[in-house]
């Protein structure tokens, strides 16, 4: 056996940090030396580009071979495995994948298209098909690619490290569909659990965790959504959907992306929604997280199909005229051993100090936004979904937890910023930069913040001191109004201000009024379940509340099942209770939501100035004893008015006077007490004439809302 160098043993033992320095073709003292490590081969030859064939000597039983050629040239390896002989391309003869400019941008944290360079990409180099793998692991001693193409042998394909800690390797004959992971030796020489690719475009179905090679450049591009569908002056009515529980097959199995594409968009369109918002579809290991603890930010979950199948779902939504928003989770990630946590043996993506790096409420890890590579990874992910899948908007989850260093932490359990404050300065900069990038590259797209505090200017431009979001969820409106309608009507007069208060700040942000998944879980009951009174009152209350919501300034969001008046809380493990529609009470609520959506879309006054104080005027605020509110919504046209009157009491009020913004005849275009919705059919016989002193004398139905517009 030949005397071996320490480098040779490092290759054999799978711990060489720079395999290209030893393996492949080298000029040594005027000789062309070729070295290869093929553990399963009994014999290896090198075949030159002009036909030269030279044997390589086996210098170690582990499978290390070496020999000489006449000159430096392109070559391939001819290896004998048992009784078969195979020609192989040597990964260690190819030039680097990352260019100098890429490395420069990566070092700065300014590479806006990480998804073009990092991860696994089918490619052709020097006429050879294969896959290029690139991963960030700056503190690792050694990184190898393991997968279907090398029998998951970490010694077979060690990678080379480039500037700033990016490891890369081109593996010939690897192809789309191959499963792979990264085998990493940490800074102390410790072997880490096999890691999934942070940039993987697909992953195995849980509980398996391997990444899957995808040629995402070949993904079909969904047709675009309607132009300007996200604009402030357009109707935005969002149907929030959890794909795994919207509807299921008879055996309780999920619908696939393509099966959903056949049913969901057409349903949402028929119901009058303008947008569909999916709870996170990024790959995640735990069903019970609903997707909010993702391990694969660049991979649509394989639960429902392939990336191509998800493209088909987005395309079907766009075909029906619907915009598609995704819930996006850049705030935290789970600590599953195959994921981002302790990725290279150090706190790479997270903070090392648990007072900064771990969420106490959720047991998850917090991204280190101050690390340029991490912020770049997340910003690029936002752009990835908009470009590759044609997504129209991102709703950013748990923004408050990102903004505050002391979020849900005890006194002394957090670390102040450099000024001694509680604001997470790096997260603020990250959010602003992300919004600038999104709107800069995709002007038709938008972002929305789930932000539950009074942080100012969330949906105001960055250059005026804002965070730059397109919209903000109005959590205060949701809490106040749900608290009000859950009271017995006899007590509501003492809570009158809970309805009025929201209008004090309704135009301080571009608000979305959310009745989201969070409001129908964890013992809060369903929306219908919060309504007081007997059966008639509960349904009438719900009809009045939904009508109040659609007449109120702000864009709308309803979680799936709210339109069915689900009795039980949402359960992610089962389908919605579609059988309820066999009962006229529940079918009436569905019809109500359908008509409210179409009214909201077709009446400019109800949407054109949703975020503009000039589009709203109170008409009645002081009738607490009768639980009545009235206001007018105004569009840009001087006659685009809609008067909304809501009676949250069980009494009928006759000759109820409401000031009319315009004289003449007013049509009652909507009445939630219609028998069509399950109501008692009390109303105004279709129209009302304004009196000489410009008032409307109305009949107010019980627990109901009426909408009136001026006759054209």
From Swiss-Prot:
One of its GO terms (biological process) is glycogen biosynthetic process. Pathway: Glycan biosynthesis; glycogen biosynthesis. GO terms for cellular component: cytosol. Disulfide bonds: none annotated. It comes from the Bacteria. SMART domains: Aamy. It is an enzyme of class 2 (transferase). Its EC number is 2.4.1.18. Pfam families: Alpha-amylase, Alpha-amylase_C, CBM_48, GlgB_N. Monomer. Catalyzes the formation of the alpha-1,6-glucosidic linkages in glycogen by scission of a 1,4-alpha-linked oligosaccharide from growing alpha-1,4-glucan chains and the subsequent attachment of the oligosaccharide to the alpha-1,6 position. PANTHER family: 1,4-ALPHA-GLUCAN-BRANCHING ENZYME (PTHR43651:SF3). Belongs to the glycosyl hydrolase 13 family. GlgB subfamily. This is 1,4-alpha-glucan branching enzyme GlgB. The lineage of its organism: Bacteria, Pseudomonadati, Pseudomonadota, Alphaproteobacteria, Hyphomicrobiales.
